[in-house]
Amino acid sequence: SVQVVLSNGTVCDAQIVGFDTVTDLALLKIDPTGLNLQAATFSSVEGCSVADTVLAIGNPGGIEFFSSVTKGIISAVDRSIQDSDTGYVMHCIQTDTAINPGNSGGPLVDLYGHVIGITSSKIVASGYESMGFAITYDEAAPIINDLMNYGHVKNRATLNISLALAS
C-alpha cells in the first residue's frame, strides 16, 4: 500500500494509477472528500530563463525533514540528460537548488508558485557541486497524461519477460 502525507500532515491512502520506470514518474490518486485541496498551477519552461530564482519542495532524508524548501537559480533551461541504463534522453531544468534524496518527485516552482518541473536527480561525483535536475513540465505532461489514461506510457518499447526457476 502507498500513503501520501499532505502539507497539513494528513495521511491518506493512495492508489497507484500508473508509473514509468524510465523517467521515475508515478501518478497517485487519493480520495479528496473533505480535504479542502488546492490544485497546483503548472507552467511551461518556455517562460523561464537562466538565473531565474526557483524553489524545490521535498522531504530530504524522509519524513523527518517533511516539506523542506530550498532556493536556487536555473543554471540551464533545456539540458538533455541521458539515462546511462536505458539510453532515454530527458529534457531537464538544471538548477543549483539543493536536491537531496527524498526531494525526488517534488515540485520545482518559480517565484509565482507555478510548478515548472519535477525534481529528479543530481550529479554526485567528485568535482561536481550544486548540479540538480528537474524534468520539465513540458516533458512530464504527456507522460502524466498517458499514466492517467493507460496506466503506462504508450508507444514505449517494453520487454515483458517472466522468469521461473526450473525444477
Feature roles, as predicted:
Residues 1-167:
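Serine-dependent protease modules
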